[in-house]
Amino acid sequence: MNNRGRYPPGIGAGRGAFNPNPNYQSRSGYQQHPPPQYVQRGNYAQNHQQQFQQAPSQPHQYQQQQQQQQQWLRRGQIPGGNSNGDAVVEVEKTVQSEVIDPNSEDWKARLKLPAPDTRYRTEDVTATKGNEFEDYFLKRELLMGIYEKGFERPSPIQEESIPIALTGRDILARAKNGTGKTAAFCIPVLEKIDQDNNVIQAVIIVPTRELALQTSQVCKELGKHLKIQVMVTTGGTSLKDDIMRLYQPVHLLVGTPGRILDLTKKGVCVLKDCSVLVMDEADKLLSQEFQPSVEHLISFLPESRQILMFSATFPVTVKDFKDRFLTNPYVINLMDELTLKGITQFYAFVEERQKIHCLNTLFSKLQINQSIIFCNSVNRVELLAKKITELGYSCFYIHAKMLQDHRNRVFHDFRNGACRNLVCTDLFTRGIDIQAVNVVINFDFPKNAETYLHRVGRSGRFGHLGLAVNLITYEDRFNLYRIEQELGTEIKQIPPHIDQAIYCQ
């Protein structure tokens, strides 16, 4: 029998034959030529080779020599180095310098701060009382996360809500879109969590899956120097994975009401020690779609819980909910006007068949960092995205009927700047914070003022400038007038030329 045929190429030239590969060790005792030794360099290699050449013949002597060598290494001396261990000291110093000690005096000077944002900001975020984050006596590790996130000082909503939330009082807060509401409740929640107590101590509920992912990411970034475990759970993802995750320590749970309620009713999510419930976009959570789930979820919380409600709009249903579930709430209202000061709003009268041509003109004339284009139906989203791509512009689309994994990927890629334009339904109007978006286009004009307010609030985030353009058909003209009156804002007719200074600074 031909022995060569038993081995695949590169393994051996038959049993016992010589193989030129220096790393090949024959299993046979009949190897004709010993494999060449590896070539080793440096003092360590020479010392190591000499030790083995001078190895004692007695087994117990060899073991004793090995133990001495291990002890010698454990004392921190590198073989071939100086006996005083200077090299190890240098390595230790290098490692220690990369870790910021929160107890050191110069902790703030050693933070890895992002590049300062020098863009113009409006009074929506600059009209503060002059407080600093350090005035609230927060944990040093939390302050480190706040500054490394790029926050310099509290915005007006943060100045109002953080000290009150830290006292344990219920809050009903109303502030404009894009003025820092997320940090206004994340900071006090992270401050109040005991990281040594491995139970769920706070729950943040939001109406959409994308907002849940965004909020959990903000919590993780702010608390990255704390040992707080943040978990996000939403519908459309694996229930089994969520159940397995809840068997691990979780301090802060972020998610949509339906999924959290489902896990709670199964007995997997235990909320008896949860002292804080945050309702972001509370007006949406109190709509007919979510309110039964929210009220059922509250029944699992202890009587002494704290409830924080944040939104830009509060319908009449909020008053009934407030009277039943909130105890002497502290009311914050920073809505002297509904729309953001930095957003300039225009309308253009067009026929339905002219909308694509008008959109193409806007793309060619405007200085767009990123834009969001809103449609009123799922079908129109996909069709419009296809048309924009055919015009030669990069474009993503997202709507509620897409698979959750696909939605997550689109949201993540658009947020990271992989694409300039996003076509979507009202799924994307709530809380989504993408700082690079400076233009919002209502391809289909919304039916009510609340939807319009949340749509245009996707641009001009955190006091920056933005532009909203509305394509108005003959049937939309009454809606345009009514929304102007309800919001107390002015939507001007679009001029032939738009100055970049009003939306690009």
Swiss-Prot record:
What keywords appear on the UniProt entry?
A: ATP-binding, Cytoplasm, Helicase, Hydrolase, mRNA processing, mRNA transport, Nucleotide-binding, Phosphoprotein, RNA-binding, Translation regulation, Transport
Query: Where does the Helicase C-terminal domain start and stop, copy by copy?
Result: 342-502
The reaction(s) catalysed by this protein are:
ATP + H2O = ADP + phosphate + H(+)
Q: Which GO terms describe its molecular function?
A: ATP binding; ATP hydrolysis activity; mRNA binding; RNA helicase activity
Q: Per the Swiss-Prot or TrEMBL record, what residue ranges does the short sequence motif Q motif cover?
A: 131-159
Mark out the compositionally biased spans (Polar residues). 20-31
Q: Tell me the GO BP annotations in alphabetical order.
A: mRNA processing; mRNA transport; regulation of translation; viral process
Residues where ATP binds: 175-182
Q: In the UniProt record, does the keyword Zinc-finger occur?
A: no
Cellular compartments annotated: Cytoplasm, P-body
Name which cysteines form disulfide bonds. Answer: none
Q: SUPFAM superfamilies of this UniProt entry? A: P-loop containing nucleoside triphosphate hydrolases
Residues bearing PTM Phosphothreonine: 237
Which enzyme class, named as a word? hydrolase
Residues covered by region (Disordered)? 1-85
What is this enzyme's EC? Answer: 3.6.4.13
- InterPro entries referenced in this protein's UniProt entry, alphabetically: DEAD/DEAH_box_helicase_dom, Helicase_ATP-bd, Helicase_C-like, P-loop_NTPase, RNA-helicase_DEAD-box_CS, RNA_helicase_DEAD_Q_motif
Query: Where in the numbering of this chain does the Helicase ATP-binding domain appear?
Result: 162-332
Q: Compositional bias (Low complexity) spans? A: 43-71
An example GO CC term for this entry is: P-body
Q: Where is this motif: DEAD box?
A: 280-283
The Swiss-Prot or TrEMBL note on domains reads: The Q motif is unique to and characteristic of the DEAD box family of RNA helicases and controls ATP binding and hydrolysis.
What is this protein's function per UniProt?
ATP-dependent RNA helicase involved in mRNA turnover, and more specifically in mRNA decapping.
Family as reported in the entry's similarity comment: Belongs to the DEAD box helicase family. DDX6/DHH1 subfamily.
User: What is this protein's name?
Assistant: DEAD-box ATP-dependent RNA helicase 8
Supply the gene name: RH8
